[in-house]
């Protein structure tokens, strides 16, 4: 068994989640990787790693997977809530089912993970929860109304729960990336919105890479437990909004 703490990462099958898994594995941590695409998790081929097919909107699935990992690696030391969806559209034309999906994954998916691990962390008086939000949780963007709303919620409840957990030496960090070169945009169904977004990305030169965000997550975690980095906002230098 590793002498380093267990790291749980949701949405770990690609993008930021996959890069974060690789970063923590390189640092010597045992991992529990959660996602709906089990084959993509297993393709990472990381040592001391348990891969589980989990839907973050199902709290029981998260709890079952974490219980299994803790039996092998010990208690969760850090939870990285990374799973999320971005479905862009205008409020009067977007399918409300897409709103519901974003609310369930981006808000409830994060809260479900917190609910499963927080009590144990408070009891042990040690632990870190890192929630991957977005710069869209701090300001609004065209076609992003509900997505911005879900990410604003992540910022709000992360800060409030951080206050509740601070006296137990449990840390909460919000990571708010700008435009990242990932699969996230592929969820959007409007070709025009996707095309416009891609044109906007071109104005930035090079968007963030998943590894850039993963390095920020690892940096926040690796600070001494007495230091809580509450929020990291990182964007391409040429991203003007």
Report the location of each language-model feature.
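Substrate-binding pocket helix/loop in short-chain dehydrogenase/reductase
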Residues: 90-91, 95-100
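Conserved glycine-rich Rossmann-like NAD(P)H-binding loop of the short-chain dehydrogenase/reductase
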Residues: 27-42
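C-terminal helical subdomain
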Residues: 170, 174-175, 195-240
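Active-site helix of classical SDR
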Residues: 114, 150
């Amino acid at each position: 068994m590793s002498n380093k703490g267990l790291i749980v990462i949701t949405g770990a099958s690609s993008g930021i989640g996959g890069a974060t898994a690789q970063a923590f594995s390189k640092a010597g941590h045992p991992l529990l990787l959660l996602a709906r695409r089990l084959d993509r998790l297993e393709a990472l081929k990381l040592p001391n790693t348990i891969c589980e097919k989990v839907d973050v909107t199902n709290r029981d699935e998260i709890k079952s997977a974490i219980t299994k990992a803790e039996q092998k690696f010990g208690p969760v030391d850090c939870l990285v809530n990374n799973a999320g969806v971005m479905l862009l559209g205008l409020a009067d034309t977007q399918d409300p089912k897409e709103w519901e999906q974003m609310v369930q994954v981006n808000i409830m998916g994060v809260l479900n993970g917190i609910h499963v691990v927080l009590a144990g962390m408070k009891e042990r008086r040690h632990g870190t929860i890192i929630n991957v939000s977005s710069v869209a949780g701090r300001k609004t963007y065209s076609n992003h109304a509900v997505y911005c709303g879900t990410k604003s919620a992540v910022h709000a409840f992360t800060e409030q729960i951080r206050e509740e957990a601070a006296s137990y030496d449990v840390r909460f960090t919000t990571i708010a990336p700008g435009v990242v070169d990932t699969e996230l945009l592929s969820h959007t169904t409007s070709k025009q919105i996707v095309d416009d977004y891609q044109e906007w990305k071109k104005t930035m030169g090079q968007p963030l890479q998943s590894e850039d965000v993963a390095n920020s997550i690892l940096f926040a975690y690796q600070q001494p437990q007495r230091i809580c980095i509450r929020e990291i906002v990182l964007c391409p230098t040429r991203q003007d909004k």
